[in-house]
């Protein structure tokens, strides 16, 4: 008797579910036009009818995105339990958060988020017992709060800090410099930087960058042949010195680093998300050549420091 009763229970449950189920919402998606675009790759023709969408600055593309967003958010707003989810997430995420502090001479810097700030704020204090003050608040750098910043390097004398600044989620960043003690921003502007820190040496720093893309191609041009430059504080960017370039491998990335005593310059090259090749240059010798330290990209290798004439490498 148990099996028939169980089947009856399932049947009644299915009827109840069917009676309560609302009619599925039918979404009316905007029409996406197709264009007559065909590319010939070594004799193989490939149709690309949506090529026009690659032009993110075109009015047609902007209108298409707005129409798509209208459909998406129009549907999301009909979900009855969505506000409850938002309220609960807001509740559990609303607590103060701090980063570990890092030292710059007699100052300490750290980030803090009061709980619901879009981005954490950089604070500075003098000594361990000093009163924290706002150093940089990225939420105030643009009307929409989408400017992202990150500290990418502190000068050896602890006087200056290099800051990477990106807008609207772009990978492109601009390096600016601030005097730590006065919280004053200098006039330096280093543009067309991607995936790079600032390796300080003397009165300037090394950084990785690309050639300036053509006007209107900033988000479409290929990122090839990343180079390493040296920027001297106070100079315009067109005076920066080219330190490294590789004309044979357009897709390689390169990052520069210096030792604490500023005697050595490291270059870490990569071809993807894993594997790195390491080169080193003696900065105490004028125009010294780069020497290959770790060859190939089979392993991850990251130089740490030079101690007693020996290079410490994390692998």
Q: Where are the predicted features?
A:
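Bacterial N-terminal signal peptides that target proteins for export
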Residues: 1-7
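Beta-propeller folds
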Residues: 20-315
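Bacterial N-terminal signal peptides
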Residues: 7-16
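Generic N-terminal leader/processing signal
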Residues: 1, 19-20
